[in-house]
Amino acid sequence: MEHISIASVSQDSLHVQGQIDDFFNSFRIGTILHRCGITKRHGHSVRSLTQAIFTLPFIGKNFFRGMVINPDVPFGKDAAYQLLKGTTYNWRKVLLRLGGLLFNFFDRLTNDDREAVLIIDDSTYDRSRSKMVELLTRVRDHTTGRFLKGFRLLTICWSDGASCLPLDFSLLSSADEKKRLCSNQKILDKRCCAYRRRKEATAKTTVHLEAMVKRILSVGISAKYVLMDSWFTLPSTVACLAQHIEIIGMVRKSPMIHYIWDGYSMDIMAIYRRLKKRRGRARILASTVARLKDGRYVKLVFVRDRHKKDWLALLTTDIQLADEDVIRIYGKRWDIEVFFKMSKQHLKLAKEIQCRDFDALIAHTTIVFMRYMFIVYQCRIESDHRTFGELFYRCCSEVDDISFIESLYRVLSLAVDQLRTTGSYCEKTASAFFDAIINTALQCVGLSKNDLVMKPES
């Protein structure tokens, strides 16, 4: 039994490695790496190094066992660390280019009436056991309310409701130098990617949002709305992002944030008190249109909080959008929470390597995001029959032509058999009645009754 289990595990590993190899070939990841400045002058190729690190969680190994002490790996740990610590490598461009190719693949499978969205959120990048990690700071975990050592991982994802693609991220430290536990350890050329990453790590969060959205839209990735939590749905942020894309976000209850409503400047709580509420246990309590200080009109939708005896408020810049659609579309924001959970628990985000170099953290986080893209791609091609290509569409057109008629014919045939069993049955009248129904339906779709004759089973 032990030999059988070992053999099955080996077969599973080979199968996964084959799928990963197909993924790298299909989307030409080696070419993407080369065009983004990630090259090697000697030794093994960048693609083989990246693919080896990429594969680790899928074969049940961590970085130490899979790369450092693994005798089967044809290169040493120094080559892997050299790849991760490169200061001129544009990992952000790698992620955007791969995301653009996957978007083109998913976009063909998405109906036009389904709203694609961008989702903005942040999560903690936990390095609680570290002391000398570059730009290390203390960040507040929103889920526990405690402070821990690490970074804030600001992420933006694309979702069509079925698949979620992480497209860009910023690893953020504290803007206050006094609050950082470890300072910058490298002297860098200000033109290189490493310097720009460190500079943005010490900037405020809201500064990055517009740049991230513009980068994503500039590579041809389209979305109808951007979804944000209450931490980001501030009037200044809304006014900035609304120049590029419509917004749906949760409103923060704060006496410091004001909207212009009914000619007066007031906070969200004051607006809610003055609105007429719907009776009973309605899910949507009220809705109204307010104005920001820059003159832009926004729609406020107040909904019942099912977990507390309280209310929540959603904001959208699309004032023509129905209240129910605002709630439905905002529900897609949950996709990024699933992504964070999956990345931390299964894809080894912030756990696989213990590098103290900031560039290595950026490179490894990018590879983790690429792993999630691979999983999303595999799930889509295995669950969505439209990935079979043109054959699917031809089969679908045939099914659309005959499925209703054939179903109606079978139902009426069963009804005739049932009437025969009752004893009171007029063959001529019933046959004429059913034939009239079938012929009328056939004329509507341009078929004949011979098309419904079932072939005998062989």
Features from the language model and the residues they span:
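Short amphipathic alpha-helical "interface-anchor" segments enriched in bulky aromatics
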Residues: I120-T124, D323-Q354
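Extended, non-catalytic structural segments that build the interaction scaffolds
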Residues: A52, W311-W334
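Active-site-proximal, Lys/Arg-enriched surface segment
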Residues: G86-D176
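Short, positively charged, Gly/Tyr-enriched micro-motifs
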Residues: I32-N104, D112-D113, D160-L165, L209-V219, ...
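A short, flexible helix-boundary coil/loop motif
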Residues: M1-H44, L56, D72, L171-D189, ...
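Electropositive, glycine- and tryptophan-enriched low-complexity nucleic-acid-binding patches
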Residues: G60, D78-Q82, T143-S222, K299-L312
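Acidic, His- and aromatic-enriched active-site or binding-groove loops in soluble protein domains
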Residues: I245-I257
